[in-house]
Amino acid sequence: MIQRLSHPSLLSLETLFKLCKSEIHLNQIHARIIRKGLEQDQNLISIFISSSSSSSSSLSYSSSVFERVPSPGTYLWNHLIKGYSNKFLFFETVSILMRMMRTGLARPDEYTFPLVMKVCSNNGQVRVGSSVHGLVLRIGFDKDVVVGTSFVDFYGKCKDLFSARKVFGEMPERNAVSWTALVVAYVKSGELEEAKSMFDLMPERNLGSWNALVDGLVKSGDLVNAKKLFDEMPKRDIISYTSMIDGYAKGGDMVSARDLFEEARGVDVRAWSALILGYAQNGQPNEAFKVFSEMCAKNVKPDEFIMVGLMSACSQMGCFELCEKVDSYLHQRMNKFSSHYVVPALIDMNAKCGHMDRAAKLFEEMPQRDLVSYCSMMEGMAIHGCGSEAIRLFEKMVDEGIVPDEVAFTVILKVCGQSRLVEEGLRYFELMRKKYSILASPDHYSCIVNLLSRTGKLKEAYELIKSMPFEAHASAWGSLLGGCSLHGNTEIAEVVARHLFELEPQSAGSYVLLSNIYAALDRWTDVAHLRDKMNENGITKICGRSWISR
């Protein structure tokens, strides 16, 4: 087709650009344009720039083509700015605007400023965005509805509600997009009452405004009102459904999440992702894999978030065979996913499923190891009885200049508990509070209680619970009761059990543990009394279950 292009029309060029598969093709088209003496045709060059701005290297090539035009007009400048703005390249976009102003040969117009504000808002560049706003006021484009809306959107995304409302109030003309931008601004700042008020005042609502308010209610945890608004929507799209699916999943209601997923039409990768992640996060790994299989059967290509959810499900199951299958699947397609998200999850999955050699290899190959990857390796080591190695890795992490946070200390304290390393655990507990000024959380205290309980230091564990600056949660008391069962201490066990009966009145676990302690001491009357109490309260022991991989 390139060879037959003797005198290209704009239409034939657009068709030709769509067929381009590589930068080599673009070079061939450009060479043909030069040979035909059409390099100064600004309409033609604008199409070339728009079509060749798909990657950073292509953008660089577009810029070189632009440079060959002696006096580019505003239309051509806008196409170049659009290419960089669509890639969210802040410095390059603003630099082109400044250069355009300096030349004096072309003036920015109502199409220029929204492109620049898009990249300013995405990068949170409040100062530069405000300066551009001042430029708009001087030039006189502030009355344009598209320009005004872009500033409402900008200030809203930067959480400057005063400026967003001020720009909106001064706009002589507003459309549905302008109103939606202000609704979104209030939603992003957590001002849901104000968002609802603006939504109610809208003369004409569009799908974006409905979706923004539904999503805001979902993210605030108000699923009841979110569903009520969702049901009132005159029209819904996959964004509407995905917000609700994600909300139900985060709230633990996977039945409602699945029902909405089945109801939605044209589900895309985001909806599949919300459902798979929901099952994984709610401890239903088999369902997560089942949905993934359904997705693959429909030829939907997974993104990195889906793969992270799948690996989380695999980690929960601890299934070596499934781990190998997921790892192999990713290994063949790694270039399609962001390693920033995928590799730490891949390390975590392999470590927790017992594939420590593979986890270690991935860990060592990381160009820059972070806190998440270190924690994944330490957890895996602890699960498989390598507590001392996990501690050495923690020390290596600190030596490399990575500062441990409260999650990292939770991990290392769990490591010490699982490996019964009392001195090390107590040392890290003090180090966390004194050197790193991290306030001990209920989870941190629970880890120490577990460590002391496992090693028979039951009185120390009990005294620690009583000295906590907050009410101990059930996991701390449960760890101590488990220690009492392990070491046969009835006196402390009875005190601990009473606390657990109050905290978790419908949990059979505490009754069963105390019953086992009595049984080990042949106190069958007490065993019978406990079972009668369970029956009176309608408490039943949940039968154990095993994972079976197919």
From Swiss-Prot:
Keyword Repeat: yes
Keywords for this protein: Repeat
Pfam families, per database record: E_motif, PPR, PPR_2
Superkingdom of origin organism: Eukaryota
Region of interest (Type E motif), residue spans: 476-550
Any one biological process term the GO annotation gives: RNA modification
Record GO terms (molecular function): RNA binding
Annotated Gene3D superfamilies: Tetratricopeptide repeat domain
Coiled coil stretches, renumbered: none
Disulfide-bond pairs as recorded: none
PPR repeats: 73-107, 109-143, 144-174, 175-205, 206-240, 241-267, 268-302, 303-333, 339-369, 370-404, 405-435, 441-475
PANTHER family noted in UniProt: PENTATRICOPEPTIDE REPEAT-CONTAINING PROTEIN (PTHR47926), REPEAT-CONTAINING PROTEIN, PUTATIVE-RELATED (PTHR47926:SF467)
Recorded family membership: Belongs to the PPR family. PCMP-E subfamily.
Matching NCBIfam families: PPR
Protein name: Putative pentatricopeptide repeat-containing protein At5g37570
